[in-house]
């Protein structure tokens, strides 16, 4: 993948993970001086910080959705969409269908990890219901917004560009993975979000979405992914 496309993926991943990264802190230094090894899976959440982490994460997600909506009418943001498209397409030598499969990768990974003995927060039935709720909210919201906004795709194929459904699906799956394994290791969530950000970058590489579509889809996916867990927790 070209440098510009990778840079966009990195920006998306950093923005989406800002709340998660700020909620992680290492244990106090209570080990003996002779201890030289450290397991990253043992990172713990600071209670004072983790209390505010969901609010911070949802604020970041809401900001991404708001950016997507603003770009529908704001000329400077539309111009940024066009310049980003031009830069990416200048180096796009081929199209790929990897994004059609990568959008599901974090969710598939959750079930694969459980199958090999790396247990998440919920059993098969509960996590399936949680993910089902998230997907239902995400899919319904995405279809509704596409029909209401009628933003033309960069390739001119139709008027269903905003928000990116692939990106929303990928980030909902990434948030699902993060929530399932946040008490095991933060690196599972980071991997899920990296896959989601790559999905968004590939949608632009394939000339199917504007940058603002990707930002809006990412924010929507994070929000609906988290909503599935919140809905189940209240039952």
Task: Identify the meaning behind each predicted range.
Residues 1-2:
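N-terminal secretory signal peptides that target proteins for export/translocation
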Residues 5-13, 17-119, 130-131, 148, ...:
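N-terminal targeting leaders of membrane proteins
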Residues 57, 128, 132, 190-191, ...:
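Hydrophobic alpha-helical transmembrane segments
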Residues 62-66, 102-112, 133, 137, ...:
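Lipid-exposed faces of alpha-helical membrane segments in multi-pass integral membrane proteins
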Residues 92-94, 122-130, 157-160, 205-207:
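Extracellular loop and loop/strand-boundary signature of outer-membrane beta-barrel proteins
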Residues 115-122, 180-183:
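Juxtamembrane helix-break-helix junctions at the cytosolic face
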Residues 129-153:
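Mid-length scaffold segments of soluble, non-membrane domains
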Residues 146, 151, 155-235:
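Membrane-embedded catalytic cores of phosphoryl/pyrophosphoryl-handling enzymes
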């Amino acid at each position: 993948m070209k440098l510009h496309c990778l840079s966009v993926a990195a920006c998306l991943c950093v923005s989406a993970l800002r709340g998660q990264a700020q909620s992680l802190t290492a244990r106090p230094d209570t080990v003996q001086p002779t201890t030289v090894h450290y397991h990253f899976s043992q990172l713990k959440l600071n209670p004072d910080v983790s209390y505010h982490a969901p609010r911070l994460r949802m604020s970041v997600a809401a900001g991404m959705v708001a950016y997507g909506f603003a770009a529908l009418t704001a000329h400077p943001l539309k111009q940024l969409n066009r310049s980003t498209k031009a830069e990416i397409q200048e180096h796009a030598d081929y199209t790929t269908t990897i994004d059609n499969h990568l959008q599901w990768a974090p969710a598939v990974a959750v079930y694969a990890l459980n199958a090999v003995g790396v247990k998440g927060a919920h059993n098969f039935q509960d996590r399936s219901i949680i993910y089902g709720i998230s997907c239902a909210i995400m899919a319904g919201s995405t279809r509704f917004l596409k029909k209401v906004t009628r933003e033309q795709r960069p390739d001119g194929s139709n008027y269903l560009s905003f928000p990116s459904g692939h990106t929303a699906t990928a980030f909902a799956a990434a948030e699902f993975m993060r929530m399932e394994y946040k008490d095991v290791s933060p690196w599972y969530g980071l991997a899920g979000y990296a896959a989601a950000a790559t999905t968004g970058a590939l949608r632009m590489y394939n000339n199917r979405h504007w940058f603002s579509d990707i930002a809006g889809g990412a924010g929507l996916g994070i929000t609906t992914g988290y909503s599935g867990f919140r809905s189940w927790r209240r039952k």
